[in-house]
Regions:
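N-terminal glycine-/serine-/threonine-rich phosphate-binding loop
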Residues: 1-40
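Glycine-rich N-terminal segment of FAD-binding domains in flavoprotein oxidoreductases
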Residues: 32-59
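Residue-level signal for inorganic ion chemistry
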Residues: 24, 45, 106
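Conserved active-site and cofactor/substrate-binding residues in soluble primary-metabolism enzymes
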Residues: 15, 19, 46, 50, ...
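Short beta->alpha linker loops
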Residues: 11, 46, 112-114
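Ligand-binding beta-strand-loop-alpha-helix segment within the catalytic cores
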Residues: 2-4, 64-115
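Acidic/polar N-terminal loop/beta-strand segments that form early-domain functional surfaces
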Residues: 10, 43-45, 74
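Generic structural signal for well-ordered alpha-helical scaffold segments
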Residues: 21-29, 56, 92-96
Length: 115
């Protein structure tokens, strides 16, 4: 495999999200196979949430051992817990409430009304 980055163009955002989800699932499964667990840093926004929805909809999602996956956030809005504008709230709706994640391995950033 080459270390040279490749530009991959998809005809629409749905296909891009599906392709990214397929690649991410492969990377997670590979990491879990070689290291026992995997960590992923999430972001919000249309593309980030589209990726999470594509992960949730993918039949290949069953290849992931969700109990051995740590989720972190690269950014977050400093709003009250449950606010629909928080990235973690959107991630819960798109993926986290759909797959059997270990809640102890979901590392959300603090909310404005939390500890």
């Amino acid at each position: 495999m080459s270390d040279t980055p490749q530009l991959v163009v998809h005809r629409d955002k749905e296909l891009m999200a599906e392709a990214a989800a397929a690649r991410l699932i492969t990377k997670i499964v590979d990491a879990q196979s070689s290291r026992g667990s995997a960590s992923v840093v999430l972001t919000g926004g249309r593309n980030g949430n589209g990726l999470l929805a594509a992960l949730a909809a993918s039949p290949a999602r069953d290849a992931v051992d969700w109990s051995r996956l740590d989720l972190w956030w690269g950014d977050e809005r400093f709003l009250p817990e449950g606010d629909p504008e928080r990235n973690v709230t959107q991630a819960r709706e798109a993926l986290l409430d759909v797959v059997p994640l270990d809640p102890e391995r979901v590392h959300a950033m603090p909310a404005s009304d939390g500890p």
